[in-house]
Amino acid sequence: MSKPFVVVSCPIDTYSGYGSRARDVVRALMRSDKYDVKILSQRWGNTPYGFLNENNPEEKKMKDAIIPPQLQRQPDVWIQISVPDEFQKLGKFNIGITAGIETDLCDVRFIQGANRMDLILGSSNHSLYALKNSVYEQKDKAGKAVGHIKLETPTDILFEGVDLEKYFPIEPKDLPKTELVQSLDTIEEDFSFLYVGHWLRGAIGEDRKNTGLLVKTFLETFKNKKKAPALIMKTMTGPASIMDRNEVLKKIDAIRKSVQGRLPNIYLIHGDIEDSDVNHLYNHPKVKAMINLTKGEGFGRPLLEFTRSKKPIIASNWSGHLDFLNKEFASLVPGEVKPVHESVVQDRLILKESKWFAPDASFASLLMKDYVNSYKGYETKGKRLAHYCKENFSFEKMQEKLEAIMDKNAPKKVEIKLPNIKKISLPKKDD
């Protein structure tokens, strides 16, 4: 019996969050060996292309599965990994996979796109919130209200599982002496907070990742301290380049100039690095905790991956990462849900009417101080969080969930069994 024909349209070969998500979904489908999987490779904004490595057997298999844009036959299952307004219905059964939008409202085109599909899979509860929360008035050509546009398609959660083979705890003595590890060794501070994320558009305290506010809060918290910790930032504003690196340094310097006093050190890691280097960074003994004062996450993948180091996390108490950052073990910063700033409004993505989270910077400051002064207790919580996430949010658990969803919804191939026909002998005609 032939396998169901599954086509996945996704940014499989890009250096992007959606690219990582796409590779995970395709890897899970291929490992299940239940489907004939083909891929329509897409670009993702201005992110770099060419991630797939032919020397990696699984990635070579993905590359070999890429087909031309013109489909020769209708897929049994069409899966599109993208933002909802790009969703198309091309298969017998159609699944849209999305991280949604980080605010509380989405554009009407997102809802219309989602309603073209048979099933929507969100990365987290928050990733589906805006789709479910947004309702638009539908009008006829004369402008008369005739109904409402709202989400009609069934939904489910397919979280982004951490790859336990790529991210795992390493004892300091076992860290390889790579260029990155040796650079981290030279940091004079023994205690460093780590931030991982893009520095996105917006005024200080208004960009989605809240990178500017984090820098300012860190500097204000530890200025003039005799023994201050460091802040290590793995960040970019766009594609890796010397110009972008200079732009990030310029932003940091501008914030430093706004804070008076003797200031703590900030170290920048810029550009794309291998997963193995990221794991070494997470496990380096000078990195004590991850911090992220984000205004909103569809999921928050680096936060989950960092849990494998068994170190504690400080993060905003809102949006996608709350699915896996158990409040018993993570340090969650309170705040308010407030309207987005005009400096971050983007057509179809971040609406001027929408809201997202404003974490309490003074509370974050107190937490950072307490981490430095009373680290042992937080270290214990980090270990418990690591166990919780390993048991509940691994790649294998994600694959199990995806297979269950596919088994339930994918059209089944019907095997036609012919009845056994008894062979008979006809009597010979007499001559």
Which functions belong to the PLM regions below?
Residues M1-P75, A230, E400, I405:
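N-terminal pre-catalytic "stem/leader" segment of glycosyltransferase-like enzymes
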Residues V7-S9, N46-N133:
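Extended catalytic core of nucleotide-activated donor transferases of GT-like folds
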Residues R21-R23, R27-A28, L164-D277:
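Conserved catalytic-core segment of nucleotide-activated headgroup transferases in glycan assembly
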Residues L119-E179:
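Donor nucleotide-sugar binding/catalytic pocket of nucleotide-sugar-dependent glycosyltransferases
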Residues T237, E342, Q346-D431:
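C-terminal amphipathic helix plus adjacent low-complexity
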Residues H280-G298, K311:
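Acidic donor-binding loop of glycosyltransferase active sites
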Residues G300-L303, W318:
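Short glycine/serine-rich donor-binding loops of glycosyltransferases
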Residues P312-A315, S331-L332:
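Short hydrophobic beta-strand element within catalytic cores of glycosyltransferases
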